[in-house]
Amino acid sequence: MKARRGEEVMNQTIYAYISDGGIQEEISQGAGRIAGTLGLDNLIMFYDANNVQLSTKVEDVDAENVAMKYEAWGWKVIQINGNDVNEIRKALKEAKAEISKPTLIIGNTVMGKGAVGADNSCYENKVSTHGQPLSAAGASIADTIKNLGGDPEHPFTIFPEVAELYAKRAKELEVIVAERYAVKDVWAKAHPDLAAKMEQWFSGKAPQIDWAAIEQKANQATRAASATVLGVLATHVENMIVASADLSNSDKTDGFLKKTHAFVKGDFSGAFFQAGVAELSMACICIGMSLHGGVIAACGTFFVFSDYMKPALRMAALMEQPVKFIWTHDAFRVGEDGPTHEPVEQEAQVRLLEKLKNHKGHNSMLVLRPADVVETTVAWKLAMENVYTPTALILSRQNITDLPAKENRYQEALQAEKGAYIVNEDANADVILLASGSEVSTLVEGAALLRAEGIKVRIVSVPSEGLFRSQSKEYQESILPAGSRIFGLTAGLPVNLEGLVGPNGKVWGLESFGFSAPYKVLDEKLGFTAKNVYNQVKELLA
């Protein structure tokens, strides 16, 4: 933001706080490495190092030298007595003066400072006081208050010198804030166009894109179609940042990268964030950017690696942050990489967040698995217009045959905005064929075999069950009438579609891990062919 709008209006310092437990969390390793590598000099982190955690002393589980670790990552490290306010002030001034790297202030503190028992025994630095009230640990709250110079009869009385200090600081801050706003107003008058853009960015409103004008190459993988859209967004959405966990050329976020350049230390004029192999850290950093405001954040990796991101997905959903998650290589068709890289259960896991409501009563996440290149454009339209919750786009590695269109494929694909729609149909259909993603084109091929025998078919694409379930009962009934015979095809667990096919239906899906083989071989072996669709539907209708 500073690189785009200047230091006059974007000169914040970001303060972070971390504990002994936080230092041990995996995400602190990724975030620490990235912040140091990029030289984020406006980041100051306080580390409360008291050597006590919930179940043990820190030394029992962690022997690392934290200062050396952060210095190795490129941080400035300041060590102080964390219980001394003068040392804290001095460290803050030093950290604020740093202009080339983030700063870690290690405050060596005393856990439960001043805590005593009724017999005046010391309760400082005890594991027992970490996760429970002092009294439950055996200390005396009244005697502790006395020991700290307070009055047990009036424990919440603010000392006069403290009240005076805070009142003085409040007045100082009022002046500082007024000065900041004055500078911002002068800047806005001098740069009205930039100020208008800034207001738009922080409004949280979706950017205006001519989605119908996006031209897609026919019969491509949906990851390639996503790259096409990202290329447009890179040139039309100035406040968008896209990240990848060392897979930009595979997850095709390079469609965005090719129109900009990656962040590097000292140059943040680009809009691409190379996170390295750190899916969880990447996702959390994107959430942080979203929480800051003014930024549209998106990040990409293989779908199977969404497993590493689950805590971040939950937090994005809980905090209602509209981060865009781009997951490619969506099924067993990853092929030769084998079962370690072939997602099976991941779609079912992620779609649970479509069923979970946030505190505003909305689906906590929008999950989209488009069926062809044009539906991918529409999926991105939905993602960018969703400014209320996170969005997931689940995309194919392999090419997909475009779905048939009566007239204008884009206009027909816009029906995906309701979560499910009819791709094509025969009057008085005998069976409904249902799928998302690349399986829809397989249904189209299977339908041709069924129609050759006089079986009437309706084909339905369901990129988002959660979105479909949010439509009126009338619309849902118009797509999937009650009592219909429905066949579902999914490259994930059958549970992905079982709620849609109902008691008169049947789902063909995977109930085991994948295998290492070319994807066309796996299609045959695992039954994802037109012939098997024909066989399964004939059996259903028998």
Predicted regions and their residues:
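Active-site glycine- and acidic-residue-rich loops that bind
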Residues: 21-27, 84-89, 218-224, 370-377, ...
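Thiamine diphosphate
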Residues: 1-13, 15, 28-157, 163-394, 398-401, 461, ...
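Low-complexity, polybasic segments enriched for Lys interleaved with small residues
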Residues: 157, 161-163
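Short loop or secondary-structure boundary microenvironments that flank
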Residues: 21, 81, 276-279, 302-303, ...
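Short glycine/serine/threonine-rich phosphate/pyrophosphate-binding segments
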Residues: 23-30, 280-284, 307-310, 440-444
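Active-site metal-binding loops of divalent metal-dependent hydrolases
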Residues: 19-22, 109, 247, 302, ...
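Short, glycine/acidic-enriched loop or turn micro-motifs at the edges of active sites
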Residues: 22-23, 51, 111, 249, ...
